[in-house]
Amino acid sequence: FDPGTMTIGRSYVFHYPYVTTPCFLIDLGSPAEPGEDLVTSEGETYRWSGGVGPNRSIVAFSAICAHKMSYPTRSVSFIDYRHKPMSGDGTGSNWWDRGQVIYCCSEGSVYDPRDGARVMSGPAPQPLAAVSLEFVAEEQALMATGIYGGAMLEQFLEKFGFQVALAHKIDDVWRPASGTTGVWPLDEYSRTGVC
């Protein structure tokens, strides 16, 4: 995927590590540095590797909310990235007037994509799982190379496997994503954005 085609602040969806598991791809517009250690709901510690790309501003996370596993579908998305503040003066004293957050309006979980999708507010018990990206400068290409943190992939496919099999018109919901996968702007992927 050519990151030069991305619009800063717009959320994109791709499927990884399986053809049925959605992830966000976001260009934050400025470098996203690695942060402090993060902890999964199982107590495992990991360190987010930060942004990639020409400006180190491109990040990717699982688009499956860590609370009740809301995720973007073709018909609706209850989870999305908000680049601009929802209200307020943008000073960041509250998450809703800071902007640059991933917000799940199903139950109100808020994640900070500049800090490894750390939970800022709401009931989510852990950050969104991080997707390892590699930027190949010679080809101007992004590649997903792994997923880490509290991925919740087994729980997701056990709970929603039948639904995603129908939506993707496939029999094997565990089929690995390989080669070139589709990348869609979320507002084109989902017909209705709720948040």
Where are these regions (language model features)?
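A conserved acidic, glycine/proline-rich C-terminal tail/linker
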Residues: 118-120
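Short linker/helix segments within small regulatory modules
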Residues: 90-99, 123-125
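N-terminal pre-ligand scaffold of iron-sulfur
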Residues: 1-92, 129-195
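Extracellular/periplasmic metallocenter environments
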Residues: 67, 102-116
